């Protein structure tokens, strides 16, 4: 009795889907959890580190801005070429760049050297995940799953990484508090950057365990095999895969010693493929609308991040730093727990409905944060908002994966990440201006309004977009295989028939001559 019950619970929570996806999913989730755990190190100590080196505040501001800009541009570039260069190579190279930045910060105290390492390397200045990792990882997970398991696996991806970020922020905060009591603070900060570099090395080692299934071509190959092409069609399948896929077959090495293909199967000449992902017109028509809505939502998130909400609560109610830390930890914990249920909910009411019906109450709560006159109700609204705030993340990624062709998925997710980051970076400046004029409450009202516009826009524009059993972009792409490939295969079959027909004719003629 206990086994069926546990099996049902595992199926409901998406654990069965996660196990079915395999080792690659575990490695991807571990990679991002590791990064989220370590992202708190630079975000907490960078300003303190620069202050200990007597850098001017204006230089620190320039450093943060240029680092964010460099991260956006580098991330966009790497995600656009990830499918061609190899997704595993991008993840491996990004981990090495993360380690490189940590080593430079551990060894150098020169402002310009540190700036170059931050702009051209990967280091988090906001406490959030940075670099090209998330877009590539979400693309990989989307390719490893199908429409039935995707939302479950992505929900666990969000859950584990959010929890790791919460634990990492708590650990980093306590470590920094301990280090502040030491006399040689600079050396202590250098030691933390060595730890940051070490986590980058660990991440690069984990990348070596990823299989070929993570690549765009490996994803296509698995998909073709699942479509049931028989044993005699192996050679044709190989031709079609090479014709259809502009990507590498794997991220680290090229297969050698592959058996020679039959000479009588002609492979049509392929056009030279660009290293950059090509976003088709059909994809752009959907993503343009979604990008505009996501920019509005990200602007709202940037106006009232956790740091500014804590500042508002501290200024209004004069609570202790420990209380603020407890509120933040509780909020992140609720985000992580609630994300578990996003997958099961999406399978029952749909991706868009899950995004809207969970995010809309959170959006309304954001606008009501300034209303309470006491700290208790304010904290209650903050926690209610946090409990529903992240439930749209996994369904959103699953929706993008469903409406975008597989070969365009990584590039589309990279552009999505760039749009969100740029829009989010504008928010704190707006809130700063409002706070300076004693109108902080307007920032919360504007946040709620923008988020409600995002939610209603999602529902109006996308609620009727079917992503279930209809022939989506993926199947359209598979069913519309390059005509030249089919023509080449058909003409080969015709030629084989002609050759056999001519052979029969010559034998008949020879038999007739012998009879005569």
Where are these regions (language model features)?
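Hydrophobic core of transmembrane alpha-helices in multi-pass small-molecule transporters
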Residues: 33, 101, 111-132, 377-392
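Juxtamembrane intracellular "pre-TM" segments in multi-pass secondary transporters
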Residues: 2-22, 217-298, 315, 481-484
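Intracellular juxtamembrane helix-capping segments at the cytosolic ends
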Residues: 123-145, 391-404
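Transmembrane alpha-helix termini and helix-breaking/packing motifs in multi-pass membrane transporters
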Residues: 47-48, 165-187, 343-344, 426-445
């Amino acid at each position: 009795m206990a086994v069926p019950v546990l099996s049902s619970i595992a199926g409901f929570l998406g654990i069965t889907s996660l196990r079915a996806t395999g080792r690659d999913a575990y490695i991807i989730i571990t990679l991002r959890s590791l990064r989220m755990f370590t992202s708190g190190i630079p975000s907490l100590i960078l300003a303190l580190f620069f202050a200990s080196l007597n850098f001017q505040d204006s230089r620190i501001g320039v450093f943060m801005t240029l680092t964010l800009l460099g991260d956006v541009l580098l991330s966009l570039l790497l995600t656009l070429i990830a499918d061609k260069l190899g997704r595993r190579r991008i993840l491996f190279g990004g981990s090495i760049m993360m380690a490189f930045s940590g080593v430079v910060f551990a060894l150098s105290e020169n402002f310009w050297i540190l700036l170059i390492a931050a702009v051209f390397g990967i280091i988090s200045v906001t406490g959030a995940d940075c670099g090209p990792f998330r877009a590539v990882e979400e693309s990989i997970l989307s390719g490893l799953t199908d429409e039935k398991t995707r939302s479950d696996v992505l929900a666990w991806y969000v859950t584990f990484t959010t929890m790791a970020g919460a634990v990492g922020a708590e650990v980093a905060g306590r470590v920094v508090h301990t280090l502040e009591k030491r006399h040689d603070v600079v050396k202590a900060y250098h030691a933390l950057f060595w730890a940051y570099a070490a986590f980058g090395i660990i991440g690069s080692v984990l990348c070596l365990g990823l299989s070929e299934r993570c690549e765009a071509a490996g994803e296509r190959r698995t998909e073709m095999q699942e479509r049931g092409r028989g044993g005699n069609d192996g050679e044709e399948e190989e031709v079609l895969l090479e014709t259809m896929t502009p990507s590498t077959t794997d991220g680290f090495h090229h297969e050698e010693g592959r058996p020679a293909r039959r000479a009588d199967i002609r492979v049509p000449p392929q056009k030279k493929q660009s290293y950059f992902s090509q976003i088709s017109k059909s994809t752009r028509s959907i993503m343009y609308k979604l990008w505009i809505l996501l920019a509005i939502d990200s602007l709202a998130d940037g106006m009232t991040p956790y740091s500014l909400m804590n500042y508002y609560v501290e200024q209004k109610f004069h609570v202790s730093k420990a209380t603020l830390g407890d509120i933040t930890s509780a909020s992140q914990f609720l985000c992580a727990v609630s994300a578990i249920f996003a997958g099961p909910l999406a399978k029952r009411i749909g991706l868009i409905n899950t995004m809207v019906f969970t995010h809309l109450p959170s959006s309304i709560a954001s606008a009501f944060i300034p209303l309470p006159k006491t700290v208790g109700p304010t904290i209650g609204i903050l926690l209610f908002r946090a409990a529903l705030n992240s439930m749209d993340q996994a369904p959103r990624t699953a929706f993008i994966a469903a409406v975008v062709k597989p070969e365009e998925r990584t590039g589309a997710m990279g552009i999505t990440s760039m749009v969100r980051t740029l829009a989010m970076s504008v928010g704190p400046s707006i809130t700063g201006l409002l706070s300076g004029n004693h109108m902080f409450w307007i920032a919360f009202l504007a946040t709620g309004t923008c988020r409600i516009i995002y939610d209603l826009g999602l529902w109006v524009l996308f609620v009727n977009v079917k992503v279930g059993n209809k022939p989506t972009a993926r199947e359209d792409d598979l069913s519309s295989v390059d005509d030249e490939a089919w023509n080449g295969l058909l003409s080969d079959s015709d030629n084989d028939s002609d050759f056999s027909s001519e052979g029969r004719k010559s034998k008949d003629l020879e038999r007739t001559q012998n009879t005569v």
